[in-house]
Amino acid sequence: APVAEVQRILRLYRERYAGFNVRHFCQIARREHGLTFSYTLVKMALQGAGLVAKRRPRGRHRRRREPRPCYGELVHLDGSRHAWLALVPGVMQTMLVIVDDATKQVLYAQLVEGGESTAAIMTALREVLTTFGLPGALYTDRAGWAVSTPTSGSAPDRTKLTQVGRALVRLGIEHILGFSPQARGRSERANGTLQGRLVNELRVAGIRTPAAANRYLRERFIPDFNATFGRTPADPTSAFVPVGAHDLEQ
């Protein structure tokens, strides 16, 4: 590669994209700056300049659960509290993310006021149900909005439904509870990837408010994320069931 072009890559990374991983940097640089070099060449240039660390080979992965075959058969809902707005240091926000199990597509991702409140969860679910339909099942952790737990660390009381639980029963959506971080893997991996990418993109875009971040998520980030990480389900049949606005008002 011409030395001048390699220097351009290094300068671009130093001045605008420091902190991005190599793959993310390549995608953004191709889209925004017309970069044409291969991932391997860019990685070697950045590593050679000491701008990114060489990654150790990964150990053997634990066998992961096979995804559901149909789009809409199972969706995951997870909240992540994090300093999403790097230009507003010290301020934490909660992001709610809903991910389809079969396709890995993000169906909903927004920063919400007040953390994982029942109102925020209901808003997120309503948007997904209105846009996509009723999923077969919803996978969540054992947060207070999801399930009644008499004492800390005790088993959930499935006979005492929360407001969200009652809504799921009424709509015929199975509610699956995760009992460990490993069990919630798919949504938490999506959140981890979101953290690694979104924080950097919001910083580069100069975004300082939750409203602007949510607009960026809807208009730019989620479509790009799904195009990059989404996959074709094993069964092309959609399991989402259309739902009318009247049904959600019940």
Q: Model regions: which residues?
A:
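Generic alpha-helical secondary-structure signal
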Residues: 12, 28, 45, 107, ...
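Short alpha-helical functional segments enriched in proximate histidine and acidic residues
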Residues: 32, 128, 224, 228
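Basic, flexible linker segments flanking DNA-binding modules
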Residues: 1-83, 152-155, 159, 238-246
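Active-site-proximal acidic segments at structured loop/helix or strand boundaries
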Residues: 194-250
